A protein has these predicted regions:
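Auxiliary Fe-S-binding modules of radical SAM enzymes
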Residues: 1-9, 20-22, 68, 75, ...
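Active-site phosphate/pyrophosphate- and oxyanion-stabilizing loops and adjacent acidic/basic residues
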Residues: 16-17, 35, 118, 141, ...
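Conserved, mostly hydrophobic/aromatic
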Residues: 15, 45, 84, 152, ...
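Active-site beta-loop-alpha junctions enriched in small/polar residues
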Residues: 34-36, 87-89, 131-135, 155-157, ...
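Mobile, glycine- and charge-enriched loop segments
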Residues: 27, 31, 41, 47-55, ...
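Hydrophobic faces of well-ordered beta-strands that scaffold small-molecule active sites
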Residues: 27-33, 82-84, 128-130, 150-152, ...
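Conserved Radical SAM active-site core
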Residues: 54-220, 389, 448-604, 608-611
C-alpha cells in the first residue's frame, strides 16, 4: 500500500519509464466499428445509458444485414476491428428477446453473437472482438472460432458495490466473483482477452489496487490478458447516477500510473481518450501505451455524449509527447499465434497484419498497380556510422512515422555519398525455361499457381533452340545479359544446366550468362555426384558468367522450414555462393520478405549477407523482393500475410543500405514488384539500381503482379530523370554498357511471341532419386 502515499508526479514518472521500457515510442489504437448487437440487458447498472428495456416498434437484435452494413462501411473506411458490444443475457429477463431469438433459430444471445460474428468475419474480413458479457468456459470455446479476441471489464473487485444502494445492485452479472470466473474461463480456453476497471463509482483506491492485482494474478496464471483498460465514470442524464460526482483527472492519472507500476512494462494499458475530452493527451503522461478502439464511422454507443477525437488530433497529441501512433488489430501482436488464434480466424488476422503484428498501415501490396500511400519526407538522418548489429537492425525495422523518415533520409544520404546521383540498370532478358518443379515452396505460384489467364498457364518446357533464339533476339535488342532460371524439373541433372550454357555461348558468345540459383547449382552437382567446386568450375568454363542470388528467400532456417523445407538451407545457400566466389563467379543476394517472417529474421538475413561478403567479397548487389501474395499457395491457404506494407518495403531497402555498408554498395529495387511510383519512392530510400529491363518476366506475374513484362530503356531512363537522378546503362558486373550495346537497346524491334511448348513434349525421364537438400540436413 506504499503506492497510496506516493506523490502523483513521482508515480507518473515511474509509469512513463516503465511504458517506454516495454513499448518504446509506440502508442497504438484500433480502427474499429462499433456494433451494438442488442441494447437489451438483464442487468440494471445505475450509470448505464447503453442498455434499455424493450421499446415498441424496435427489434431486440440487429439483423445480420444491418450488422454487415455497418461492418462494410467500416471496412471501406480502413477499420480492422468489429467490436460487438451488447447487453448481458437479455433473454433471461425479456420475453421479446426470447421470442426473437426463437424466430432467428437461436437459443441464446450468445448463439446469435456467434452467427453475426461469423458473418462479419467471412463477408468483410473485419476481425470480431466480442464483449458478450459473463461467459462459461464452454461459451468462450464456442466464441473462439469466430473472433480474434474477447473482453469483459472486471470493473471492480468490491462486493459492496453490488449491495442495496450500490451502482451494481440488481445486476447479477456484475458480481465480481462471476466476472473473475469469466476471465479465468477465457484463460483456460486460450482466448486473447481484454479487461479493466471502472473508477469513480464508489470504490476506494485500495479496492482499485486489489482489482488490478486480481487481474495480474490471472494474467500470470494463463498469459491471456492482452490489455487492461482504466476507464473513468462519466455521469449521464437519465440514469440513477446522473448527479454523482465524476472522478477528477488527477484521480484517473493516479490510477493509470498505479496500474502501469503493478502490471509492469510489457502490459498493454489503455484509457479511452474520448472520456477525458480536451485533457486526453495527459493520459500519456501516466503511462498508457494504447488509446483503444477509435471509429471513423460509428459513435461510442456506451458513451454517446463523448465523441472520439479525430485521428489527426490523436496523432498530434501522441507526437507532442515524442511518441508515434500506429494502428493495431483487436488482438495484440504477442497473441498472434496458433496457440491463441483459432485456425478459422488466423487467415484473416494474417492478411490484416504487418510484420510486427500490427494493422497494415496502408492498402498497398507488391505487384498491384495502385497509387503508393506516401513518399519519403525530408528529415534529419539518424546517425548510422557504426556497424549495425542484429539488435540494432531489428530495432530500426520497427521505425514508424518521423523515425522512419529519419531512417529513409539516412539511407538516401549514404547512397548519395557512396554512389552519387547515378541510377544504373542493365538490358537483359529473363528466360524461365520451365514452370515444372518438384520442390514444395509455399510462396511459389510460378510452378504451383492456378492455371489462370496471364498467370502460370499450362506446364511447359522450353527446348534449347528456343532458348538460343530468345538470346539472339535479346542481343539484337541491345542486351548484354541473359538471366536464366526456372523450376527444377524432376528429370534435370547437372548436365542439363551445362548444355544450356554451352548452347547459348556457342550462338551468342558476347552475351553474359547470369544463370542458376543456389538450388539449381546444388541439385546439379548432387545429381552428377561431384563436389560443388568442380561443378561450378565446369559451368564457368562452359561460359557461365555469374549467379543470381535467388533461392535465398530468408536466410534463417526457422523461416525456411515453414516456406521451403526441402530447398537449400541457409548454410547450403551461403556455401554455394562462397564456392562460386572462390572459382571466380560473382553473384548477388536477394531477400523475399512480407510473408511469415518478421524484423528479427530480416536482421539475421542482412547480417549473414554482410558476413559472407566480408569473407568472399563478390556479391554485386542486394535485391529486396517484396512477396507478391495474390496467387501464392500459402497465402491462399491463409498461412501468410498479404506481402509487406509500403512503409516496410521502403524500410527494407533503406536499412539494407545502412546495414550492408561498406561491404555491399549497390541496392536494387524490383520495378516488377513496386511499379513506377514505388520505384520513384525507393530512389529516395537508398536505392541506386533498377535491375534489368527483363523483356519477359513470369515469376511475379504468376503470383499476381500487374506490372508489365518489359521496362524499355527509354522508359527506364525517363523514370530515373523524373526522380532527379542520372541514368546509366550498365553491365551485369556494373561496368558501363558498351556504346554499341546501348545504341542497339533504344528503339528496339518488338519481341516475337515466345514459344513455351507443353511439358509433355519435353521427353525427359526422371532419375530414380530426387535431390532435396533441405531434407538431407
Amino acid at each position: 500500500m506504499e503506492l497510496l502515499a506516493r506523490p502523483l508526479d513521482e508515480l507518473c514518472a515511474e509509469a512513463r519509464a516503465l511504458r517506454d521500457e516495454g513499448h518504446g515510442h509506440l502508442v497504438t489504437y484500433s480502427p474499429k466499428v462499433f456494433i451494438p448487437l442488442t441494447k437489451l440487458c438483464r442487468d440494471v447498472c445505475h450509470y448505464c445509458t447503453f442498455a434499455h428495456p424493450p421499446r415498441r416498434g424496435e427489434r431486440a437484435y440487429m439483423s445480420i444485414d444491418e450488422v454487415l452494413a455497418v461492418a462494410r462501411v467500416g471496412a471501406a473506411a480502413g477499420c480492422r476491428e468489429a467490436l460487438f458490444t451488447l447487453g448481458d443475457k437479455p433473454e433471461l429477463r425479456y420475453r421479446v428477446a426470447r421470442d426473437e431469438l426463437e424466430a432467428l433459430g437461436c437459443e441464446t444471445t450468445l448463439d446469435y453473437v456467434a452467427r453475426a460474428a461469423e458473418a462479419v468475419l467471412g463477408e468483410t474480413g473485419l476481425l470480431p472482438h466480442l464483449n458478450p458479457g459473463v461467459m462459461t468456459r464452454e461459451d468462450a470455446a464456442r466464441m473462439r472460432p469466430v473472433s480474434a479476441s474477447m473482453g469483459l471489464m472486471l470493473e471492480t473487485i468490491s462486493d459492496r458495490l453490488s449491495a442495496r444502494g450500490g451502482p451494481h445492485f440488481g445486476s447479477p452479472d456484475k458480481v465480481p466473483a462471476r466476472r473473475l470466473e469469466t476471465l479465468a474461463a477465457a484463460g483456460e480456453e486460450r482466448v486473447p482477452f481484454t479487461t479493466g476497471i471502472l473508477i469513480g463509482i464508489g470504490e476506494s483506491r485500495a479496492e482499485r489496487i486489489e482489482a488490478l492485482l486480481g487481474i495480474r494474478e490471472l494474467a500470470e496464471r494463463y498469459g491471456h490478458v492482452q490489455e487492461v483498460i482504466v476507464q473513468n465514470f462519466r455521469a449521464k442524464p437519465g440514469t440513477r447516477m446522473a448527479a454523482a460526482s465524476e472522478p477528477p483527472l488527477e484521480e484517473l492519472l493516479w490510477t493509470i500510473a498505479v496500474a502501469r507500476i503493478l502490471l509492469g512494462p510489457r502490459a498493454h494499458l489503455q484509457a479511452p481518450p474520448n472520456l477525458s475530452y480536451d485533457d486526453f493527451p495527459r493520459l500519456l503522461d501516466a503511462g498508457i501505451d494504447d488509446w483503444g478502439g477509435v471509429s471513423p464511422v460509428t459513435i461510442d454507443h456506451v458513451n454517446p455524449e463523448a465523441p472520439w477525437p479525430e485521428l489527426d488530433r490523436l496523432r498530434r497529441a501522441t507526437e507532442s509527447r515524442g511518441l508515434e501512433l500506429a494502428p493495431r488489430l483487436p488482438v495484440y501482436p504477442e497473441w498472434i499465434s496458433g496457440e491463441w488464434i483459432d485456425p478459422r480466424v488466423m487467415p484473416a488476422v494474417l492478411r490484416a497484419s504487418d510484420s510486427l503484428g500490427l494493422a497494415r498501415e496502408d492498402g498497398w501490396s507488391p505487384g498491384e498497380d495502385v497509387s503508393i500511400p506516401f513518399v519519403p519526407r525530408d528529415a534529419l538522418p539518424i546517425d548510422t556510422r557504426a556497424e549495425l548489429g542484429e539488435e540494432e537492425i531489428a530495432r530500426l525495422f520497427r521505425a514508424r512515422g518521423h523515425e522512419r523518415d529519419r531512417v529513409l533520409a539516412a539511407a538516401d544520404s549514404l547512397r548519395r555519398e557512396v554512389c552519387g546521383d547515378e541510377v544504373s540498370y542493365v538490358v537483359t532478358r529473363n528466360i524461365q525455361y520451365t514452370n515444372v518443379c518438384y520442390f514444395r515452396c509455399g510462396f511459389c505460384a510460378f510452378s504451383k499457381g492456378k492455371l489462370a489467364a496471364n498467370l502460370r498457364g499450362a506446364p511447359y518446357f522450353v527446348p534449347h533452340d528456343e532458348i538460343v533464339r530468345r538470346c539472339q533476339e535479346a542481343w539484337e535488342r541491345g542486351a548484354t545479359e541473359v538471366c536464366l532460371q526456372g523450376g527444377i524439373h524432376p528429370a534435370f541433372t547437372g548436365d542439363y544446366y551445362l548444355s544450356v550454357v554451352r548452347a547459348i555461348k556457342e550462338a551468342v558468345p558476347g552475351l553474359h550468362v547470369h544463370a542458376f540459383s543456389a538450388l539449381e547449382i546444388w541439385q546439379g552437382a548432387a545429381t552428377l555426384e561431384v563436389p560443388l567446386e568442380d561443378y561450378l568450375t565446369e559451368l564457368r568454363d562452359a561460359g557461365l558468367s555469374s549467379l543470381p542470388g535467388t533461392a535465398a528467400e530468408i536466410l534463417d532456417d526457422e523461416v525456411r522450414q515453414v516456406i521451403c523445407p526441402d530447398k537449400v538451407t541457409t548454410a547450403q545457400w551461403l556455401q554455394v555462393h562462397d564456392v562460386a566466389h572462390r572459382v571466380g563467379l560473382r553473384s548477388n543476394v536477394t531477400m523475399m520478405f512480407g510473408h511469415v517472417e518478421g524484423p528479427r529474421n530480416w536482421a539475421r538475413h542482412l547480417v549473414r549477407s554482410r558476413e559472407q561478403q566480408r569473407s568472399s567479397g563478390d556479391f554485386t548487389e542486394f535485391v529486396p523482393l517484396p512477396f507478391v501474395h495474390m496467387e501464392a499457395p500459402m497465402w491462399l491457404r491463409g498461412q501468410a500475410r498479404s506481402g509487406p506494407t509500403f512503409g516496410e518495403t521502403l524500410l527494407v531497402h533503406a536499412i539494407a543500405r545502412l546495414a550492408l555498408h561498406p561491404w555491399i554498395t549497390n541496392i536494387q529495387v524490383s520495378w516488377v514488384k513496386l511499379g513506377a511510383q514505388g520505384v520513384a519512392a525507393a530512389l529516395r530510400a537508398g536505392v541506386n539500381d533498377l535491375g534489368g529491363t527483363l523483356m519477359n518476366e513470369s515469376i511475379s506475374r504468376s503470383a499476381g503482379a500487374e506490372h508489365g513484362q518489359e521496362f524499355a530503356p527509354e522508359a527506364m531512363e525517363e523514370l530515373i530523370r523524373s526522380a532527379g537522378r542520372i541514368p546509366r546503362q550498365r553491365t551485369t558486373l556494373y561496368g558501363d554498357a558498351p556504346e554499341e550495346r546501348r545504341l542497339a537497346s533504344f528503339g528496339a524491334a518488338p519481341l516475337a511471341e515466345p514459344w513455351n511448348p507443353p511439358v509433355k513434349d519435353a521427353r525427359l525421364v526422371a532419375p530414380p532419386r530426387l535431390v532435396r537438400p533441405g531434407f538431407a540436413t
